[in-house]
């Protein structure tokens, strides 16, 4: 029996691939870390239905080997997803300093090793179904992201062209570095300064009504949705499998949350876009900022 679902976990050394595999193991996936390339057939022959396989730069000599591995699995017809784990260079530097472990590329400096690996793995990042930046993500939030992604994939059409992650954030806490497209909605009047709305958030009807009724909001959204309905098919044509759209306001509680939820719903129901998988996250809520 062929495996029902194989998840390939790859990415930058020190970014958290082992943590990712541990989370998937807790989600009932049988995990294999650092699988040598060339054992593709054994993955397909096993009767295990849910497999998560860790592959990193130690495993392959060049990205061509990785793509050969991936294409072999794809051609078998087995359902497969690629999750790419990354983090900011400063975070990876700090993690290596604490662990006192050597980077697998062993360049003159640790930073050079990190930057070289980032460059080598860029083509793999581009075809990933899910890209996660662990710079500011706690393990609990990482688990939530995985669950959202996998639950969405379980009910999807097998002809899905692209996975679209739409996230809200607050600029006061820093910008999300995994963004492909970023929109700043701080030009819209802030509900935070209205006493009865201050403690509410973008899920509350009063906040949604206030934000979306603003003249600036209407004009912005009138342009935003058609722009994305144009851009997304272009990304699909270029072979992009994952797109992260970030919308930010001051605290990531009112305006950005409202727009993310509305945009996600409208993209799902778009008559222009077909076979897309849309899922949402609200960074500041997940980090406990509201």
Curated annotation (Swiss-Prot):
One Pfam family this sequence matches: PapZ_C
InterPro entries, sorted: P-loop_NTPase, RapZ-like, RapZ-like_N, RapZ_C
Origin: domain of life: Bacteria
Keyword ATP-binding included in the entry's annotation: yes
Residues that coordinate or bind GTP: 56-59
This protein's UniProt keywords: ATP-binding, GTP-binding, Nucleotide-binding
Binding residue positions for ATP: 11-18
UniProt GO molecular function: ATP binding; GTP binding; molecular adaptor activity
UniProt similarity note: Belongs to the RapZ-like family.
Record function comment: Displays ATPase and GTPase activities.
HAMAP family, per the entry: RapZ_like (MF_00636)
Cited NCBIfam families: PRK05416.1 (NF003828)
Name by which UniProt lists this protein: Nucleotide-binding protein FN1089
Organism of this sequence: Fusobacterium nucleatum subsp. nucleatum (strain ATCC 25586 / DSM 15643 / BCRC 10681 / CIP 101130 / JCM 8532 / KCTC 2640 / LMG 13131 / VPI 4355)
């Amino acid at each position: 029996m062929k495996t029902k679902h194989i998840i390939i976990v790859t990415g930058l050394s020190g970014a958290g691939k082992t943590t990712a595999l541990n989370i998937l193991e807790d989600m009932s996936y049988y995990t294999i870390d650092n699988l040598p390339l060339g054992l593709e057939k054994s993955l397909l022959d096993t009767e295990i239905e849910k497999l998560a396989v860790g592959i990193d730069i130690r495993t392959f000599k060049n990205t061509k080997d990785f793509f050969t591995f991936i294409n072999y699995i794809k051609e078998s017809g087995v359902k497969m997803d690629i999750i790419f784990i990354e983090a900011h260079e400063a975070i990876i530097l700090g993690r290596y300093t604490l662990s006192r472990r050597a980077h697998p590329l062993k360049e003159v400096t640790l930073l050079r090793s990190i930057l070289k690996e980032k460059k080598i793995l860029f083509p793999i990042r581009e075809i990933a179904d899910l890209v996660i930046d662990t710079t500011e993500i706690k393990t609990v939030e990482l688990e939530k992201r995985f669950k959202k992604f996998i639950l969405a994939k379980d009910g999807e059409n097998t002809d899905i062209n692209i996975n679209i992650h739409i996230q809200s954030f607050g600029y006061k806490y820093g910008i999300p570095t995994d963004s492909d497209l970023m929109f700043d909605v701080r030009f819209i009047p802030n509900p935070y300064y209205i006493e009865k709305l201050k403690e509410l958030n973008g899920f509350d009807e009063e906040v949604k009504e206030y934000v979306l009724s603003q003249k600036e909001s209407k004009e912005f959204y009138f342009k935003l949705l058609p722009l994305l309905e144009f851009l997304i098919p272009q990304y699909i044509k270029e072979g992009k499998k994952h797109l992260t759209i970030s919308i930010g306001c001051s605290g990531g509680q009112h305006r950005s949350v409202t727009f993310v939820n509305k945009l996600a719903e409208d993209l799902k129901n778009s008559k222009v876009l077909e076979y897309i998988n849309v899922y949402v996250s609200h960074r500041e809520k997940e980090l406990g900022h509201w």
